[in-house]
Amino acid sequence: MPLLKIKALNNNTTLYVWKITESFDELFRSVALKDVSLARLEGMKAESHQKGFLSVRRLLMEAGYIDFDLHYDAFGKPHLADGKHISISHSHDFSVIVISQENIGADLELLKEKTLKLAPRFMDVTHLKGLSETDSLQKATVVWGIKESVFKIKNEVGISFKDHIFESDFNLNDKQCKVTLRFNNKEEYFHILFDFIEDYVFVCAFNSVSLSDV
């Protein structure tokens, strides 16, 4: 079944997961798109991106919305017409949306060896010490998703994943951790939830504490 999961992350935040098994035509016939969305869809070269785009619109329908309720600001951040926050992610055969009363950022990542090889570029690799190769890959992918999720909330030019976004050390079984963003002489704090969906990592960041001077 394409709609894989609906899960409450907290009292006012819901995750919707779609596993893409349909053809492009099946997905296209199942949604109504506004003109700007149709133009965006037609501009996508890869069918996988087109199917991801359409599956997100199916998830919107599951959440009680349609494509006409969704718009993007000048920075590419999605917004809903009713004022609720939304974050969107698509990776290969899966799409997710998270809808919340809170400011959130969500990311979905396929587990792949390349992420572990690149880990020194975006994280404190001492957090991988003593782990098996499998656990190291999972943890590095979670950390990448954490930093993507935080960036989706802030979306400010100049933020470096390695130099500005710092995750507390965590165990994979915890499925949560804390993150600090140190940028422009400010500190901001985030609460992170993560989970594993087949061969993917799902991460959601919540903006937990207001900005304060360092």
Q: What kind of region is each of these model predictions?
A:
Residues M1-V214:
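Core catalytic alpha/beta fold that binds nucleotide/phospho-ligands
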